């Protein structure tokens, strides 16, 4: 066989240079394979509840940490030093994409992210700079590659992005919103411009996720955190088509990267199907508040569906069927319970979900005051429940 694309060849060599994975339970669960134990990781497992993170933040502002691979890796590693987690997730933020598109994003203490010059009208879309956006996000790829080596194969590394609707909401509202009323108004007032906006974001997201996979991400999560503001009809209009396009376009691109034949020598896997696994990462969709559309989510082609805490996992399994992995879905507020009560809740959650095709997690990111002991209890309970 002959090499048709040197870039593809170099990509595969780069991916194979990473240390071999020692704990692959997360990836096995996502693929529906037998696991040694129920894998567990926690959304926002790296962050403000850890004193070592707070110390680092005294020296560096939030986005400096995100943009500096050494600092991003340090924060990513912090929870792994404390807890027996089955995954790491690169420290970053979904709003790096609006930044790369030319918008200013500031992190205000006690408020959260603020975009001082939001997109108010369709005319403002001209301010966005999608050309070259990926080149302004390479620091994330650098952090992912660095982190894969620092992990030394301990656990898989997850990359992530915000979904188009969620990013559009922040960019229109100028930050977080309890209603997303301005963004929702676009769906009715500017339907064609909304489509153009969402397509623009989708295309940048696909570029961004492809870069993360090539950098070394072994799983990807797409955060549709603002789905809770959409009715089912609105979700199927303003979210679902773009989530589908992300998956389809990404898989198509990554598949094409390894279609050119490569030499079957000892430095490469022994067949094309194994080669594909190097590039086609497993995909998680987490659409918070979109329990009304689980069936539709199950038809998008994602490997894992994340559940928020309002969804009964038994009912979710009945809806999505046996061939999709579920992730979640402990109420983050339960992390403030007494240890014995938390242990009972976590154990009950795992019993409901079972050991097959399940990843234990919370139903949304944990909050800044989460007790460290609660993380210890959750991880231990998830591992020992079955």
Curated annotation (Swiss-Prot):
This entry carries the following GO cellular component terms, namely: cytosol
User: Which pathway is it part of?
Assistant: Porphyrin-containing compound metabolism; protoporphyrin-IX biosynthesis; coproporphyrinogen-III from 5-aminolevulinate: step 4/4
MF terms (GO), sorted A to Z: uroporphyrinogen decarboxylase activity
- InterPro entries to which the protein is assigned, alphabetical: UROD/MetE-like_sf (IPR038071), Uroporphyrinogen_deCO2ase_HemE (IPR006361), Uroporphyrinogen_deCOase (IPR000257)
Say which domain of life the source belongs to. Eukaryota
List its EC numbers: 4.1.1.37
Q: Which UniProt keywords apply?
A: Cytoplasm, Decarboxylase, Heme biosynthesis, Lyase, Porphyrin biosynthesis
Reaction(s) this enzyme catalyzes, per UniProt: uroporphyrinogen III + 4 H(+) = coproporphyrinogen III + 4 CO2
Binding of coproporphyrinogen I occurs at 44, 46, 48, 57, 93, 170, 225, 364
| UniProt-annotated binding residues for coproporphyrinogen III | 44, 46, 48, 93, 170, 225, 364
Cellular compartment(s): Cytoplasm, Cytosol
Q: Where is this site: Transition state stabilizer?
A: 93
What S-S linkages are listed for this chain? none
The membrane spanning regions, by residue number, are none
CDD domains associated with the record: URO-D
Please name the top-level EC class of this enzyme: lyase
PROSITE patterns for this protein: UROD_1, UROD_2
- Pfam families named among the record's database cross-references: URO-D
Q: Describe the task this protein carries out.
A: Catalyzes the decarboxylation of four acetate groups of uroporphyrinogen-III to yield coproporphyrinogen-III.
Q: State whether it acts alone or in a complex, and with which partners, per the record.
A: Homodimer.
Instruction: Report the sequence similarity comment from the record.
Output: Belongs to the uroporphyrinogen decarboxylase family.
Protein name, UniProt field:
Uroporphyrinogen decarboxylase
Provide the species name. Answer: Drosophila virilis (Fruit fly)
Q: Which gene encodes it?
A: Urod
């Amino acid at each position: 066989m002959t090499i048709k694309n040197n870039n593809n060849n170099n990509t595969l060599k780069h991916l194979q240079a990473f240390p071999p994975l020692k704990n692959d339970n997360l990836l096995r669960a996502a693929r529906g394979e037998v696991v040694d134990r129920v894998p567990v990781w926690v959304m926002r497992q790296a962050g403000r509840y850890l004193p070592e993170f707070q110390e680092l933040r005294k020296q560096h502002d939030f986005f400096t940490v995100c943009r500096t691979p050494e600092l991003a890796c340090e924060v990513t590693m912090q929870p792994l030093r404390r807890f027996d987690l089955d995954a790491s997730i690169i420290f970053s933020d979904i709003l790096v994409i609006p930044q790369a598109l030319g918008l200013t994003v500031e992190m205000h203490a006690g408020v959260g992210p603020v975009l001082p010059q939001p997109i108010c009208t369709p005319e403002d879309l001209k301010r966005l700079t999608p050309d070259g956006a990926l080149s302004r996000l390479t620091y994330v790829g650098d952090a992912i590659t660095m982190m894969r080596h620092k992990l030394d194969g301990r656990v898989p590394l997850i990359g992530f992005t915000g979904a188009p609707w969620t990013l559009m909401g922040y960019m229109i509202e100028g930050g977080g919103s309890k209603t997303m009323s301005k963004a929702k108004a676009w769906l009715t007032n500017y339907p064609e411009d909304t489509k153009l906006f969402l397509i623009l974001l989708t295309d940048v997201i696909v570029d961004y996720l492809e870069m993360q996979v090539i950098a070394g991400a072994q799983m990807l999560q797409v955060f549709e955190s603002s789905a809770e503001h959409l009715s089912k009809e609105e979700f199927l209009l303003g979210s679902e088509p773009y989530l589908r396009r992300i998956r389809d376009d990404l898989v198509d691109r990554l598949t094409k990267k390894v279609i050119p034949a490569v030499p079957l020598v000892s430095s490469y896997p022994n067949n094309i199907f194994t080669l594909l696994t190097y590039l086609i990462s497993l995909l998680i969709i987490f659409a918070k508040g979109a329990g009304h559309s689980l069936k539709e989510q199950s038809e998008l082609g994602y490997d894992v569906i994340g559940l928020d805490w309002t969804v009964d996992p038994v009912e979710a399994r009945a809806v999505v069927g046996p061939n999709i992995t579920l992730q979640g879905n402990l109420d983050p507020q339960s992390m403030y319970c007494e240890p014995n009560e938390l242990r009972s809740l976590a154990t009950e959650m795992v019993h409901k979900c079972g050991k097959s095709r399940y990843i234990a997690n919370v139903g949304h990111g944990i909050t800044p005051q989460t007790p460290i002991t609660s993380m210890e209890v959750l991880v231990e309970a998830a591992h020992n429940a079955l």
